[in-house]
Amino acid sequence: MYLFFLIVFIFISFSLIFFILLQPGKGLNNTVHSHTKNNIKFFNSIGTNNFITKIIKILAFFFLLISIILCNINSKRIDSDFFWEDNQNNTITKKHVLDKKKLNLDIPN
């Protein structure tokens, strides 16, 4: 499950980069660099880039959603391993109490 989401996450990342770089600039320098008729026809056929901006919004939403899912999956793996090991050894409370005593040695009563 984790591997599937990771592969989809990487694919969405690269496609976001591709579509963001595909957008033409809207400044005056853009006309200097695109004198060919093919570039103008390609970008005008999209319809003032509404299609590309919608795709970018959808991909950005999925990027955020999958990153949250990956974080939750990863944190559950770490937390479950941590509590499983500590429940076997029963060392959480002993170490915790000893650490507090060590920290309070320098403080006068």
From Swiss-Prot:
One Gene Ontology term of the molecular function aspect: protein-transporting ATPase activity
Keywords: Cell membrane, Membrane, Protein transport, Translocation, Transmembrane, Transmembrane helix, Transport
Main location: membrane
GO cellular component: plasma membrane
GO terms for biological process, alphabetical: intracellular protein transmembrane transport; protein secretion; protein transport by the Sec complex
Keyword Lyase: no
Source species, domain of life: Bacteria
Transmembrane segments: 2-22, 51-71
Record localization: Cell membrane
Membrane topology: Multi-pass membrane protein
Similarity-based family: Belongs to the SecG family.
Function (record text): Involved in protein export. Participates in an early event of protein translocation.
Quaternary state and interactors: Part of the prokaryotic protein translocation apparatus which comprise SecA, SecB, SecE, SecF, SecG and SecY.
Name assigned to this protein: Protein-export membrane protein SecG
Organism: Buchnera aphidicola subsp. Acyrthosiphon pisum (strain APS) (Acyrthosiphon pisum symbiotic bacterium)
